[in-house]
Amino acid sequence: MFSRDLTIAKYDADLFAAMEQEALRQEEHIELIASENYTSPAVMEAQGSALTNKYAEGYPGKRYYGGCEYVDVIEQLAIDRAKELFGADYANVQPHAGSQANSAVYLALLQGGDTILGMSLAHGGHLTHGASVSSSGKLYNAVQYGIDANGMIDYDEVERLAVEHKPKMIVAGFSAYSQILDFPRFRAIADKVGAYLFVDMAHVAGLVAAGVYPNPVPFADVVTTTTHKTLRGPRGGLILARANAEIEKKLNSAVFPGSQGGPLEHVIAAKAVCFKEALQPEFKTYQQQVVKNAKAMAGVFIERGFDVVSGGTENHLFLLSLIKQDISGKDADAALGRAFITVNKNSVPNDPRSPFVTSGLRFGTPAVTTRGFKEAECKELAGWICDILADLNNEAVIDAVREKVKAICAKLPVYGA
């Protein structure tokens, strides 16, 4: 028998110490990685619940194990809320991650060797959109489109490549693109060549849910997303679609048993919490502020003479090119880290450095907005970052910024009393 008094603190001091240090880091550091956010205590409560004990292969009402009557209720809640949130007719909440959701889509609708047309990783796409190092680039014939000299997706190039290569599927989505995707144009191109349109909205799902970014569901054959990032839920995946019995059946089979076994019902419960939170009016206010904050930060960098890829942002993220300053993203990342500002190095278009070094930084505002930052704080923060980038090895500047970071983080904690 287990005692509920047997906590990690009592049982495993080494692990508990590391967990506490990470919790302190999250409170004391400013988080600007575009794919990170902070979940609510309710989301974490669901993930740490007794649901982790339950095996439930199959789908609600069609399980291969007994004792699933309550997890059926939980999973159906998550499904229904996801459909309501995004205006979808179909939702599969079982994918363990966004990459697994994407793999399931490929498995459902493609054959090995089929051609896919996706955004180049070097131009802001994602590994799973056909990058050579990913299974999506190994199992399928991946053709890549990119951005033009102004940092915008070249839709004429997308159409030209589609006509030339006749892909079975066109992939729209990104990991580092700061503009609005033209879903109607993607749909028209897909229809012209008889391709499926698959949209990966992992980065902007929260913005879509709040109505501050266009919804791809009415245009795409299938849509995937993660449930963290801007959606602010647990780490996991989600597949959405309009009504199509054939595609729905293929997607369900591709998730289970095609690529996964038992679903993580404790994570699915956390997804249900997340979807309920995203259906509230205050979530729209939050997402509007996320975009305002990103625009405010990008504006400061432009004023200080830095190159923002695409000239600004229309969503939650933007890329900063440091080619002109001859600074590597790796060195900039490390210097900002010493000031308790967490970012990630990122390749930029025409980057002369390797992906392990890069010449750019990616910034995102979901996490700082969750802790209460508004435009004023974000402009001040961007100024501090510019000060460090202007003199990367000046430890006095880094030390001064770190103290300012600690002060503002104490004023605006992630988790209050």
Swiss-Prot record:
It catalyses: (6R)-5,10-methylene-5,6,7,8-tetrahydrofolate + glycine + H2O = (6S)-5,6,7,8-tetrahydrofolate + L-serine. The keyword ATP-binding does not apply. Its main location: cytoplasm. One of its GO terms (biological process) is tetrahydrofolate interconversion. GO terms for cellular component: cytosol. PROSITE patterns: SHMT. Signal peptide: none annotated. The record marks H228 as: Plays an important role in substrate specificity. Keywords: Amino-acid biosynthesis, Cytoplasm, One-carbon metabolism, Pyridoxal phosphate, Transferase. Its cofactor is pyridoxal 5'-phosphate. Belongs to the SHMT family. Homodimer. This is Serine hydroxymethyltransferase 1.
